[in-house]
Curated annotation (Swiss-Prot):
The lineage of its organism: Eukaryota, Viridiplantae, Streptophyta, Embryophyta, Tracheophyta. An anthocyanidin binds at residues 24, 161, 392. The keyword Transferase applies. It comes from the Eukaryota. UDP-alpha-D-glucose binds at residues 152, 352, 354, 369, 372, 374, 377, 393-394. The active site is at residues 24, 130. Keywords: Glycosyltransferase, Transferase. Pathway: Pigment biosynthesis; anthocyanin biosynthesis. In the presence of other necessary color factors, this glycosylation reaction allows the accumulation of anthocyanin pigments. This is Anthocyanidin 3-O-glucosyltransferase. It comes from Zea mays (Maize). PANTHER family: ANTHOCYANIDIN 3-O-GLUCOSYLTRANSFERASE, GLYCOSYLTRANSFERASE. It catalyses: an anthocyanidin + UDP-alpha-D-glucose + H(+) = an anthocyanidin 3-O-beta-D-glucoside + UDP. GO terms for molecular function: anthocyanidin 3-O-glucosyltransferase activity. Belongs to the UDP-glycosyltransferase family.
Length: 471
């Protein structure tokens, strides 16, 4: 409702709706914190909506990181997770299903009311949220507020999800026979093969919870989003991808990598938590001589592939730092850990401060699952990559790294010891690797320019703040 003549408009109240699984909520919180800081002069307040378990994890991470406390104009608001109280142990896919069913059945509307109550009755003027929680679109419309979704993955993956119906019509039941066919008839996707598409687009179980979720999201975004935040920066996406998205979503706002928005979100590079001594170990290694290996917190190779990877790292002769969950250590080759520790040639740890590691001058190669956050962290650190994708959008990301941007290589299928040794040697010392290393440095410079004073990402984030706060 507009204020009467002579009355001033109340300050903006932005509801930020999280998808409380994996790293989604943490990424959205980094944006919310940057938004809260930028919008403070307008008197804006933000309500960050997530489940109890998600908020507990965020609070724990904040307490462990200096400077990561909430701004005074940003509050946490707990929302139900949709699970029956009697269910004590619920698998994550089922948790996602229950959460999204609750969201679609009017849950988001109730959450916005909870945000209003927590803000002393202040009406929600804009709904910013993880794009996965697409029911927020209707809830925002009911509240008379615009919906501004945040996409956390790559632009090419978003394009694939939006074009899912057209891709299914094109590929039909021939996905298995056309795995290497380029998607040349689909604007923005001509550099990608059928096999690179995310799970559930043209193959796999279309009714699996996450596949249903992103399909519905892809249908909802073009008709309901007032603007869409993209986790990329101008100059990274090829022109055909940018043009295809702009035709479907005319108000895209690219200002990624999101972790660079606030200096304190990068604080772990200055004084990182490093309980396993990764940085001290790196300090004893040659410049650009170390291969860093990590597949994130979800993906993990099979035991036989882990053994091949371990053998390949040893055969490469390069020092390596490997972040690997401890429950996978028993699958490593006999004596591998002892040999690495005894010679000082390798360090295997259950966790590493990844951004700080990638920025260390001793790291010259990154063996990764090609999750989008990891790709951006490696890219913004100028480190070439060897990608072993497993699921989701990782195959598209690996294809982008190797064939679109050219600052790395991609394994086709499972890793072998010979393949790992060759990839690591090439990235660190090879002639083709020199080209990849140079390309990685070019992209690193583009990121630095985009986030420097007057850079395009800074300008775009200012535009995002204006869109969110003008309602």
């Amino acid at each position: 409702m507009a204020p009467a003549d002579g009355e001033s408009s109340p300050p903006p109240h932005v509801a930020v709706v999280a998808f409380p699984f994996s790293s989604h909520a943490a990424v959205l919180l980094s944006i919310a914190r940057a938004l809260a800081a930028a919008a403070a002069p307008s008197g804006a307040t933000l309500s960050f909506l997530s489940t109890a378990s998600s908020l507990a994890q965020l609070r724990k991470a904040s307490s462990a990181s200096a400077g990561h406390g909430l701004p005074g104009n940003l509050r946490f608001v707990e929302v139900p997770d949709g699970a029956p109280a009697a269910e004590e142990t619920v698998p994550v896919p089922r948790q996602m299903q229950l959460f999204m069913e609750a969201a679609e059945a009017g849950g988001v509307k109730a959450w916005l009311e909870a945000a209003r109550a927590a803000a002393g009755g202040a009406r929600v003027t804009c709904v910013v949220g993880d794009a996965f929680v697409w029911p927020a679109a209707d809830a925002a419309a009911s509240a008379g507020a615009p919906w501004v979704p945040v996409w956390t993955a790559a632009s090419c993956a978003l394009l694939a999800h939006i074009r899912t119906d057209a891709l299914r019509e094109d590929v039909g039941d021939q996905a298995a026979n056309r795995v290497d066919g380029l998607l040349i008839s689909h604007p923005g996707l001509a550099s990608y093969r059928v096999r690179d598409l995310p799970d559930g687009v043209v193959s796999g179980d279309f009714n699996y919870v996450i596949n249903l979720l992103v399909h519905r999201m892809g249908q909802c975004l073009p008709r309901s989003a007032a603007a869409v935040a993209l986790n990329t920066f101008p100059g990274l996406d090829p022109p055909d991808v940018t043009a295809a998205l702009a035709e479907i979503l005319p108000n895209c706002v690219p200002f990624g990598p999101y972790h660079l928005l606030l200096a304190e979100d990068d604080a772990d590079t200055a004084a990182p938590a490093d309980p396993h001594g990764c940085l001290a170990w790196l300090g004893r290694q040659p410049a650009r001589g170390v291969a860093y290996v990590s597949f994130g917190t979800v993906a993990c190779p099979r035991p036989d592939e882990l053994r091949e990877l371990a053998a390949g790292l040893e055969d490469s002769g390069a020092p390596f730092l490997w972040s690997l969950r401890e429950d996978s250590w028993p699958h490593l080759p006999p004596g591998f850990l002892d040999r690495a520790a005894g010679t000082g040639s390798g360090l295997v740890v259950p966790w590493a401060p990844q951004v700080a590691v990638l920025r260390h001058p001793s790291v010259g190669a990154f063996v990764t699952h090609a999750g989008w956050a990891s790709v951006l962290e490696g890219l913004s650190s100028g480190v070439p990559m060897a990608c072993r994708p497993f699921f989701g959008d990782q195959r598209m990301n690996a294809r982008s790294v190797a064939h679109v941007w050219g600052f790395g290589a991609a394994f086709e299928g499972a890793m072998t010891s010979a393949g790992v040794a060759t990839a690591v040697e090439e990235l660190l010392r090879g002639e083709e690797g020199a080209r990849m290393r140079a390309r990685a440095k070019e992209l690193q410079a583009l990121v630095a320019e985009a986030f420097g004073p007057g850079g395009e990402c800074r300008k775009n984030f200012d535009r995002f703040v204006e869109i969110v706060c003008r309602a």
